[in-house]
Amino acid sequence: AESILYSHIPGYEGPSPKQDAVENLKKAIKLSNPQSQPLKLVSEKFFKEQAHLKTSTKIRKTNNIQDFMKWIGMVDIREIKKVHAGNYVTYLSESGKMAHNTLSNKVSDIKSLFTWAESRGIVEYNPFVKVLLPKKAKKIKRIPWDNNHILTFLNFPKIEFNDIAATAIAIYTGMRLDEICNLKFDDIYEDAFHIHEGKTESAARTVPIHSILSNLLTQCESKSKDGYVITGLNPGGYDQKRSWNFQKRLGRLRKHAGLPETVVFHSLRNTFATRMENLGVPKNHISQLMGHEDGNMALDVYSGGLAIEPLRESIGRLSYGHEVDAL
């Protein structure tokens, strides 16, 4: 600080000030002007108006905008131009292997800050509008698991009880991993799984328990110390999902077991749907069991949905053959 203050005085013999320190001081003085619009303060005002956001979304937006602020430094938001936006996207795309959706979310979150600032008259335009992202890599098409995939995975030496239980519930119910991980024994009654909420409105549903799962669920209950069907999971991610770390574990196991990239846990839902369709189960039954809101599998029923008994009969028809059913 002393070198910055006195270095311009004739006869000063102290150390020369560091250039970055000088620049930061200049920025700080500039931003202290009452007419300035520091990016940090504008972002704080922005988030005060974002109370409606889900916790996970707000945390993600906060992190992504803070990362941008660290990159660009102390600036007046009005000084940020399209060249800065373009350079930041290039920086992100070249800084390491990043999924296209992750990059898109980062840019979208920052863009939302500038959209808000423009609507408040703080900036004249949004520099992140029409900033092109790198081309998305060709998506790997997921395929349903066949019996060989299922047997290879479930017989893999490093598989543990929770891995088997989650996989079995998935192939005999079509449930999402997050739904399976959030299942409590309090949600199991009248010989059915009762899912109270989920990814979509139609995710709340009742799924009859396949007879093959009965013994497995008894074992799950005897092992559970927290009331969950899949017990002892460590939550993770922005919103502390129980499935967060477990999903990563299952991915590593699939890779080590030698399953192809096209076979992921979520494609067990495709496996369930395909098997049910091949059995001639009506599509509206499959749709309700899976909690679909896909237009191709829209419910042809009243808003109350189908009665439980027709669904129980449909799910009872499902079989993967003796080898899988006996596991």
Label every model-predicted segment.
Residues 37-65, 95:
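Short, aromatic/basic-rich helix-turn unit that serves as a nucleic-acid recognition element
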Residues 144, 197-201, 290-320, 324:
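Catalytic-site neighborhood detector that most strongly recognizes the C-terminal catalytic loop/helix
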Residues 187-190, 260, 281-301, 323-327:
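Short, polar N-cap/turn motifs at the start of nucleic acid-interacting alpha helices
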Residues 168, 172, 179, 267-293:
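C-terminal catalytic core of tyrosine-transesterase DNA break-rejoin enzymes
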Residues 1-37:
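N-terminal helical hairpins
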Residues 210-260:
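Active-site/catalytic core of tyrosine-dependent DNA strand-transfer enzymes
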Residues 149, 173, 182-218:
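Conserved tyrosine-mediated DNA breakage-rejoining catalytic core shared by Y-recombinases
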